[in-house]
Amino acid sequence: MSDRKYSAAKIAPRIDAFLRAVTKSAGFRLSFEVADAQSPHPEFENPEVVVRFSGPDVELVLNNRAELLLALEHLTMEMLGMPPEDHTRLCFDANDYRLLRMEELRLSAAAAADKVRHTAVPFTFNPMTSRERRIVHLALRDESGVRSESTGVGSHRQVVVYPEGAPSESQPAPLGPAGPQYSTRRRRR
């Protein structure tokens, strides 16, 4: 028995009608297919349904780190009424962007871990989506000598990689016996 909540057979007609209207209104020369997903990296991302775009205007949806692709994905999830906890079950892709981006994030996470281990200085990634942050956290979970956490709010959330045992930026440093003057952190002015 499958524990799939969504399938292409169930939601494809609604996705098809919605995306056809949007792409036609925008004048995009795009085609797409809705299919049950087969994830090459289920430990990082395991969607149940994937929408793959192709056509002459496919590069437009991939500009600016796939901003339009992600916006179409988000609007489609809203149209379907998917709760936030189900957002990883639907994935939009074009030209294998998601797979390439996942590999890029995994390699960046490994490089950041090496840098933090050698310098003992935290490394902060640029802001990224919750899916991308999850991929970085999962890539770092088995790296020794480092830990990661997300900081920031909204579209400014980012992953910070810390040396193991180092305090988080949001955590106060331990105080010495006589109070703040013995803190191991510098005061910001």
What are these regions (language model features)?
Residues M1-R189:
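RNA-contacting regions in translation and RNA-metabolism proteins
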